Amino acid sequence: MSNSGRLVLRPWIRELILGSETLSSPQAGHLLKVLQDSETPGPSSAPDTPDTGAVLLVSDGTHSVRCVVTRNAIDTSDWEEKEFGFRGTEGRLLLLQACGLRIQVAQDYAPAEFYLQVDRFNLLPTEQPRVQVTGCNQDSDVQKKLNKCLEDHLSESASSSAGLTLSQLLDEVKEDGDHRGALVRLAESCLVLQGPFTARPLTHWATSCSQATEEAVFTVPSFLLHISENEEQILSSIDSSQKAQENPASPSLMPQEESGASVSLLSALPTSDPGQKDNSQPPPTVCSTSPRAQAPSSTPCSSTPSSPLLTCSPSLSPLRHAPTSYQACETRTQFHKLEFRELQWPIKRRQLLPRTGAQEPHSVWEPPERHRDTSAFQYKYGTPSASLHTQVQTARLSPQLVAWALNIVMESELPQV
């Protein structure tokens, strides 16, 4: 006790935690804060309701510790105001007579720490100003002891839970497997309501379809594979005309209707002028069918060395009904006429060879630089090669293809009924 009447506290909390862990004699502490006040059980409360008492923060002047006061300690104390609880008693001195050290394991948001469980105490009327001090669990030596105690606690809990051997665990797993198998068999027996089900055997088609999953399958509509009567008549007439053209007596004596059935894109017609034997052949002409009547005095195909390419476009009248064999021949005689139109395409003059003086075998065609409306081309094309020019000249359309195209065009022009 000092001259001013203030009681000087002696540090004892740290030594208690690191030493004996129990009080050998009563120790005085300063009540700093009431963390949880005690609740006096009333007559309406259940008899088995647990009561933890009060939770106080007590200091020895150097360190502070959390003290849990049991309900039994509160009931047996000589404190006269215990019915009102610890609220309002902050700053008073607390004499701890019996207490023990406990460890709180970390759970939820509460950290692991040491605390004191108070079994007997006495609250003194002396009151002093409160001074904040450091918690005892923040001391380095106390932290080391806390970690060691937690390791011992975990090892003890692990050893106590290891009561089953490996063989016992395997037996438990086997029993669970047998039980699960019995449940599966019971469920299968409940699901079979109409007896065993026999799957139908797979056909060869189903097996091939299941195996060829990565192959592409294409289908063709049946109406595209059907040949109508009109097409059969046209094909038969074309076959007869083709057989007659295989061994002709003379190209000049070929009938007009049979010569009109075969039309070439670029047909080269040589001339019989004896004065042109030493020169190269004249440029080819382009011939196509036309329904217009041609004058008897006009020549079928005539050309000169300086004449441009000739072409003509087909103009067909609609087909009214299916023609007979005689009418088909007459129709071909009437429709397959030739008409010529000039295309104003510039042709490069033939150049003489440097040594022999002969002309090139084929003229070189240069693509036009502008459209017919004098507008410039958007793209520039190169000059075609001589081999491509030769391939185009020798191209031929078969009579079957020409007749088929003629039939398609004529059918498309029929009026819709």
Swiss-Prot record:
Phosphoserine carried by residues: 25, 313, 317
Segments of skewed composition (Low complexity): 296-309
Region (Interaction with POT1): 156-245
Keywords from the UniProt entry: Chromosome, DNA-binding, Isopeptide bond, Nucleus, Phosphoprotein, Telomere, Ubl conjugation
GO BP term, example: telomere capping
GO molecular function: DNA polymerase binding; protein-containing complex binding; telomerase inhibitor activity; telomeric DNA binding
Covalent cross-link site, Glycyl lysine isopeptide (Lys-Gly) (interchain with G-Cter in SUMO2): 348
Classification via InterPro entries: ACD, TPP1/Est3
Identification of the protein by name: Adrenocortical dysplasia protein homolog
Organism expressing this protein natively: Rattus norvegicus (Rat)
Primary gene name: Acd
